[in-house]
A protein has these predicted regions:
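Short N-terminal helix/helix-N-cap motif within the alpha/beta-hydrolase-1
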Residues: 47, 213-216
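Conserved protein kinase catalytic core
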Residues: 73, 212-213
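Hydrophobic helix-cap positions at the C-terminus of alpha-helices
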Residues: 21, 25, 29, 99, ...
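Glycine-rich P-loop/Walker A and Walker A-like loops and their local beta1-loop-alpha1 context
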Residues: 2-52
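Accessory N-terminal region flanking or inserted into the helicase ATPase core
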Residues: 2-5, 14, 102-207, 213-214
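Catalytic acidic motif of RecA-like/P-loop NTPases
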Residues: 43, 209-210
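Conserved P-loop NTPase-based nucleic-acid remodeling module centered on helicase motor cores
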Residues: 32-142
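Short, well-ordered loop/turn elements at secondary-structure boundaries
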Residues: 1, 31-33, 60, 198-200
Length: 216
């Protein structure tokens, strides 16, 4: 397995080069092993159109356009793990609200802010960032312990304390029953060795300005 980088400034033609590379391989051998074109969610439709509308290609079954989430769903359907109920942003907000109510006696700061406009949404974004940067509840607990030992700012101490409680409680509530959008990528990483679809696939990654540690 080799890794190649195509570099250049914005507008230099990197996407055109990649698409032409994929088209050439499809023309050469239409029944070839899978080609995966991995792009940001907002690029999937246009990328699919560009491939499907290529003159001379009789279908694009061998080449598929995916976002990270769509690829995760495809692999989980093959290997198992897609049976858990997907938790939308609304569902996540409801679960966070429930946790804040149930844990209000343990919380030092968040219980006073739970009713404020936008707080639950901000809380969700904080939890999403923790997952994207591969920080587990256990690591969060370790970080909190270190900060509590040296940090003088009581407000920050209280925030870290409460965030640790909410994050740990959320993961316990999700375990085995629900899956949120960020967890799809974690499961994808675990299932890659079991996927026959990915075994001989060629993967092209395009359109990302940056990648989170979870995506990497």
């Amino acid at each position: 397995m080799s890794l190649q980088f195509l570099t250049g400034r914005s507008g230099a033609g990197k996407t055109t080069w990649l698409l032409n590379e994929i088209r050439g391989k499809l023309r050469e051998k239409p029944d070839r092993s899978p080609i995966i074109y991995l792009v940001p969610e907002q690029m999937t439709f246009m990328s699919e159109y560009k491939l499907a509308s290529t003159p001379g290609l009789n279908g694009t079954i061998a080449a598929q356009v995916y976002s990270f989430t769509r690829l995760a769903w495809r692999v989980l359907q093959e290997t198992g793990g897609s049976s858990r109920t997907h938790l939308s942003s609304v569902g996540m907000n409801m679960m966070i609200t429930k946790i804040l109510e149930e844990k209000k006696e343990e919380l030092k700061l968040f219980h006073r802010s739970a009713g404020k406009t936008g707080f639950i949404g901000n809380m969700e974004q904080m939890l999403i960032e923790l997952k994207r940067y591969c920080i587990t509840p256990e690591e969060m607990k370790s970080i909190t312990s270190e900060k509590l030992a040296v940090e003088a700012d009581q407000s920050l101490k209280d925030k870290l304390h409460d965030l640790e409680i909410v994050y740990g409680s959320l993961e316990q509530a999700l375990a085995g029953k629900y899956i949120d959008s960020e967890d799809y990528l974690t499961l994808l990483a675990q299932k890659i060795p079991q996927s026959a679809y990915l075994q001989d696939a060629e993967v092209y990654i395009d359109g990302f300005y940056s990648l989170t540690p979870q995506e990497l």
